[in-house]
A protein has these predicted regions:
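Periplasmic/extracellular, small/polar-rich flexible segments of pilin-like filament-forming proteins
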Residues: 55, 59-125
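Aliphatic-rich helix starts adjacent to a transmembrane/signal segment
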Residues: 37-54
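N-terminal/domain-start alpha-helical segments
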Residues: 15, 20, 71-72
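Regular, well-ordered alpha-helical segments
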Residues: 32, 40-43, 59, 63-66
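N-terminal leader/signal peptides at the extreme start of proteins
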Residues: 1-15
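Glycine/proline-rich, flexible active-site/cofactor-binding loop segments
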Residues: 15-17, 36, 105-108
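Alpha-helical hydrophobic helix detector
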Residues: 18-37
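Conserved catalytic core of two-component sensor histidine kinases
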Residues: 24, 51, 58
Length: 125
């Protein structure tokens, strides 16, 4: 009787190969679903970051105008403004208006422009 109990216990330890293959297959299916969704989330994040940087630069242009009665000729003249690491901005301004354009290297083929003369001023394509 004792030998039979020991034999059963030694056979019941661990998982079978089939059980492990089923678990690996389930993990593979979940990964196949999750990875494309993750890439889409990243794209939306990069686009949101670009919009935020363009809006912040536009706010910086308005702050510059309050102090100098003209808009800043470049983004480097804006007080206390720095864009995100992946965002590249171009600013131009005169006494009558300004334009801020930007791209984000994480979201290729997506550009946002804030032109003070436009209504609405922010346009992204």
């Amino acid at each position: 009787m004792r030998k039979m109990t020991n034999a059963r216990q030694s056979k019941s330890k661990g998982f079978t190969l089939i059980e492990l293959l089923v678990v690996v297959a389930i993990i593979g299916i979940l990964a196949a679903i999750a990875i494309p969704q993750f890439a889409a989330y990243r794209q939306r994040g990069y686009r949101s970051q670009l919009v935020a940087d363009v809006r912040n630069a536009a706010t910086g242009q308005e702050a510059y105008f309050v102090d100098h009665q003209t808009y800043g000729s470049s983004c480097t003249t804006l007080p206390g403004f720095t864009s995100s690491a992946l965002t590249s901005l171009t600013c131009s301004g005169t006494a009558s208006g300004f334009t801020v354009s930007g791209t984000n290297s994480g979201a290729p083929n997506y550009t946002c422009t804030w032109a003070s003369a436009n209504n609405p001023p922010l346009q992204c394509t």
